[in-house]
Amino acid sequence: MSTENDVAIKVIVELQAKSGKRAELKNLLESVAAKYGPGQPGFLGSLRYEVLDNPNILVEIADWASAEVRATAMQQAMADGVYAPLEDLLAAPFRATVIRQLP
């Protein structure tokens, strides 16, 4: 029987770029996904989107094998400073929502 930590999850991350920084934010997200995504244990892929009525908001939806492997990967990424460049590009703190499919 699988536990809650073994269930595949999706993470929806909403990022609002500072005025004039949207292209830089988009490029940074693509670069981080290409460099760190494929080698991350438990990372199943991600797609990036734009919000139609607010083009400064970008959304990334990532698939992970479990909440536990994502938490481990995020702790390591933060320790390594992977997301440090976001500070200069974001108008507000990013928002991350972790979801799983209903049983």
What are the residue ranges of the model-derived segments?
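Non-catalytic surface loops within mature trypsin-like serine protease
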Residues: 17-19, 66, 100-103
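Short, surface-exposed ligand-recognition loops at beta-strand->loop->(often short) alpha-helix junctions
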Residues: 16-27
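An amphipathic, aromatic/His-enriched active-site/gating alpha helix that lines ligand/cofactor pockets
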Residues: 31-44, 63-97
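Glycine-rich beta-strand-turn "strand-cap" elements at beta-sheet edges
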Residues: 1-10, 44-57, 82-103
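Short, well-ordered beta-strand segments in beta-rich or mixed alpha/beta enzyme
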Residues: 8-16, 45-77
